[in-house]
Amino acid sequence: MSRVCQVTGKRPVTGNNRSHARNATKRRFLPNLQTHRFWVESEKRFVKLRLSAKGMRIIDKKGIDTVLADMRARGENV
């Protein structure tokens, strides 16, 4: 499974580690992904999503039904 948030689309980005001497070595910044089950009352079932902490906050704000409708409009299979 890829390291991509299903709600926000956040994915790993690359950058540099910087030592005290300012030497640069490549590294990846990974999103804070969590797997979470949400109860969808309209469908009477649980939906399991892999999402970032920001994605959870979006669901808290908009509601799971609205977020799922947006995801389905993008063509995501949930």
Curated annotation (Swiss-Prot):
Record-level GO BP terms: translation
Keyword list, A-Z: Ribonucleoprotein, Ribosomal protein
Region (Disordered), start-end ranges: 1-20
SUPFAM superfamilies in alphabetical order: L28p-like (SSF143800)
MF GO annotations: structural constituent of ribosome
A Pfam match: Ribosomal_L28
Top-rank taxon, per record: Bacteria
One Gene Ontology term, aspect cellular component: cytosolic large ribosomal subunit
NCBIfam families with a match to the protein in the record: L28
Stated family: Belongs to the bacterial ribosomal protein bL28 family.
Protein name per Swiss-Prot or TrEMBL: Large ribosomal subunit protein bL28
Taxonomic lineage: Bacteria, Pseudomonadati, Pseudomonadota, Gammaproteobacteria, Vibrionales
GN (gene name): rpmB
